[in-house]
Amino acid sequence: MNTNWILNCPAPKCGKLAEGYYNAGPMLADDRNGTTKEDSKMQLIFDVTKADFNEYVQNLKTLGVEGYLERNLGADNFFAFHYAGKHYHVNYLATRGEMRIIEDAAYVSCKDFGYEAMGTEQTILYQYALYYDPDNNVTDKTVNCGMLYIIKLSDNSLVMMDAGHIRQWNEEAMNGLWQFLHKITNTPQDGIIRIAGWYFTHAHDDHTDGCTKLLHRYHNQIQLERVLFNFPFRGYTGGYSDTVYDMKKAVSTWYPNAKLLKLHTGQKFNLADMTIEVLYTHEDAATKEALGKVSLRDFNCTSSILKATIDGKTVMLLGDTNIETEALLAKYSDKSLWKADMVQLAHHCFNFLDTMYEWIAAPVVIVPNSYGGAHQPENVAKLAGAEKYVQDNQIYYEGSGTYGLIPTPDGWKQVEFYPLVGGEYDFSGF
């Protein structure tokens, strides 16, 4: 193994070190003009075995390093530790014969990020209604994408997932969301809305804009405790939306003490009574031959994939996952990890993901699009890949209204419904 080791943790003494490193990107720093001091870095060692991984972990422990995450996903193994003021995440990927070590410079560990609590409230997942173009088009007043999921946890805090496009948030819609957050948490109008975490699947505007607008309007009445995502380095790839940086600025300006978690495959943590497992990030697509770029043609494949478990029932959160991610996982992932009780249909029903939906085989499907958008002639066959596993007609469209679903011994069940609030964009901005 050569000596081109740039990370600040001890280097493994096995295998071959790939040339260079993969810049996995920062959290809230603006990287439009180049690298930042917050960037996470990953180095890759190949031609290694599980015995090599075990030896490296043991050597770290001999040095007094205390790991805070040690687990496996199928044949893959993960070890996370703190060393010299930074956090490190080690992945051993068995089918590739690789060990990947990621250095996080500016964030908390997944152990310190999460918390466990069992309150008295019924935990409920809402697919929050957004307005979609009725003809599945994109105009100056409408879009055919965007999504927002809200999970009210048992301690009456909220976890938000993505946020919708600015063109889905006219003033009526934004006020409707604000009133909805008060209603489901039974918070008085002059009270504080507690958001335990806001998760963003990837760096597209139809997944971040609504957060920016909500924080601009109501940050004085919102307690935002945590933010979690993994966006790649801007310099490695096209496809970023510039308004994503407005979201970053809003969070850093109004919530400088919010805990930030850079997501990595293998992490597992709790938010109150919900357990989150990270099954994929864009880091998994990096190759030893080309660490200096994102090896994905479609930026949507930088979407992280999470599996959430609440009261024993699971939901697979796919973001805008596309076929490149599916092909990578088909080659390297343990398929048994993917079975779930509910699935968020990927990328607004724009992609064929029949293989992935077969692994998941979810009897409940939540669709981040309208019924009309999902049933456009070009989308019907894409929907069918997930729809074939649906039981009791449990397929819910975000454009039809807000659906509230709870975990029960018999699976996820719809228990609440609220009509769509809002319509075409009114150019009210953030």
Provide a role label for each language-model segment.
Residues 168-229, 332-350, 361-365:
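Active-site metal-binding motif and surrounding structural segment of the metallo-beta-lactamase
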Residues 205-220, 236-247, 355-358, 377-381:
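Metal-dependent catalytic neighborhoods of phosphoester/phosphodiester hydrolases
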Residues 150, 158-162, 194-201, 225-230, ...:
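Structural recognition of the beta-strand scaffold that forms the well-ordered cores
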Residues 226, 232-285, 297-298, 364-430:
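Binuclear metal-ion centers of metallo-dependent hydrolases, dominated by the metallo-beta-lactamase
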Residues 145, 167, 203-209, 233-237, ...:
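Active-site environment of divalent metal-dependent phosphoester hydrolases
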Residues 47-70:
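Amphipathic alpha-helical segments
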Residues 106-193, 262-339, 407-430:
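Core dinuclear metal-dependent hydrolase active-site scaffold
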Residues 1-42:
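Compositionally biased P/S/T/G-rich terminal and signal peptide-adjacent segments
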